[in-house]
UniProtKB/Swiss-Prot annotation:
It comes from the Eukaryota. It is a single-pass membrane protein. One of the components of the core complex of photosystem II (PSII). PSII is a light-driven water:plastoquinone oxidoreductase that uses light energy to abstract electrons from H(2)O, generating O(2) and a proton gradient subsequently used for ATP formation. It consists of a core antenna complex that captures photons, and an electron transfer chain that converts photonic excitation into a charge separation. This subunit is found at the monomer-monomer interface. Pfam families: PsbM. One of its GO terms (biological process) is photosynthesis, light reaction. Belongs to the PsbM family. PSII is composed of 1 copy each of membrane proteins PsbA, PsbB, PsbC, PsbD, PsbE, PsbF, PsbH, PsbI, PsbJ, PsbK, PsbL, PsbM, PsbT, PsbX, PsbY, PsbZ, Psb30/Ycf12, at least 3 peripheral proteins of the oxygen-evolving complex and a large number of cofactors. It forms dimeric complexes. It is found in: Plastid, Chloroplast thylakoid membrane. This is Photosystem II reaction center protein M. The lineage of its organism: Eukaryota, Viridiplantae, Chlorophyta, Ulvophyceae, Oltmannsiellopsidales.
Amino acid sequence: MEVNILGLIATALFILIPTSFLIILYVKTEAVNDM
């Protein structure tokens, strides 16, 4: 089976971008709650 590099990159970005966005929001919320 041939690996589609562009497909892997697109999938990785599709997963990582929303995940990192949620992590940033979570960290900001935690920081505000600690104040």
